[in-house]
Amino acid sequence: MTGVFDSLVADMHSTQIAASSTYHQHQQPPSGGGAGPGGNSSSSSSLHKPQESPTLPVSTATDSSYYTNQQHPAGGGGGGGSPYAHMGSYQYQASGLNNVPYSAKSSYDLGYTAAYTSYAPYGTSSSPANNEPEKEDLEPEIRIVNGKPKKVRKPRTIYSSFQLAALQRRFQKTQYLALPERAELAASLGLTQTQVKIWFQNRRSKFKKMWKSGEIPSEQHPGASASPPCASPPVSAPASWDFGVPQRMAGGGGPGSGGSGAGSSGSSPSSAASAFLGNYPWYHQTSGSASHLQATAPLLHPTQTPQPHHHHHHHGGGGAPVSAGTIF
């Protein structure tokens, strides 16, 4: 771009120098005495060349040839005043055209800046006023969303004695509530489901702590001891079953000791099964089988039948507890 601009400036400078040289050359012949209509026309055209170059610097040669060509058919010999008038009107029109867009542009710029400045104080002055209430509204929301201060300020739920008694009775039956049971219990006690759920959670954790510390034996809460003692009776129950099996095997070595071994092995599994099943009252079928085992165990002692037949009953009695144990 700079090279093109420099070339244009050099061309303009050369055309101005040529125009000034022709101006000096044409001004000398009229002083010598060769004045005619052609001389007037050439001098007038040469006089106006330097005036054309400032107004239209880039296309000076074309404009000068255009006006000189237009001058000869119109003016003829006495057309000396016509180019002055024509050029004056053109220059006036050009200056007017140049001034009109410039004035319009200046007014447009001024209007834009005025409008911008009129909006600027509104934007700067109103934005802090609008931001302050937003900050005030957001601060309580942040406190609410945090939740921790709200949880600290939340009051504790105070249960009545009737509600506590009903919850305790339900907890003794089962430690875990299904969704329909929890909804029914909450509606009957006038509590929310969340309050019932949290009470059961707290009660379970408290019961586990008390049971682990030994404050609550498992016999006092057979129904409520479903979850914590659930790990211990299976440990003790296989021990009783295993204890009965070696005793039975050891007792079965001699023909005379088979009866006593059968009696002891039949009684110990039945007692272990009854003790184990006592912790689970909802297993009605298994508790029935345990009572059946307790009923069949005493029948083995009085009926001292011959050894092979009694040995057959011994295997039958030993097979029944094993089949009951497979339920677990």
From Swiss-Prot:
Family annotation (Gene3D superfamilies): Homeodomain-like
Cited SUPFAM superfamilies: Homeodomain-like
The species this protein was found in: Homo sapiens (Human)
GO BP: any one term: hippocampus development
InterPro entries: Distal-less_Homeobox_TF, Distal-less_N, HD, HD_metazoa, Homeobox_CS, Homeodomain-like_sf, HTH_motif
Compartments, as annotated in UniProt: Nucleus
GO molecular function, a single term: DNA-binding transcription factor activity, RNA polymerase II-specific
Compositionally biased region (Polar residues): 16-28, 52-72
This protein's UniProt keywords: Activator, Developmental protein, Differentiation, DNA-binding, Homeobox, Nucleus, Phosphoprotein, Transcription, Transcription regulation
Region (Disordered) location: 16-81, 211-270, 300-328
Primary role: Acts as a transcriptional activator. Activates transcription of CGA/alpha-GSU, via binding to the downstream activin regulatory element (DARE) in the gene promoter. Plays a role in terminal differentiation of interneurons, such as amacrine and bipolar cells in the developing retina. Likely to play a regulatory role in the development of the ventral forebrain. May play a role in craniofacial patterning and morphogenesis.
Domain of life (superkingdom): Eukaryota
Subunit structure: Interacts (via homeobox DNA-binding domain) with POU4F2; this interaction enhances retinal ganglion cell (RGC) differentiation.
A GO CC term attached to the entry: nucleus
Modified residues (Phosphoserine): 232
DNA-binding region: 152-211
Similarity remark: Belongs to the distal-less homeobox family.
Protein name as catalogued: Homeobox protein DLX-2
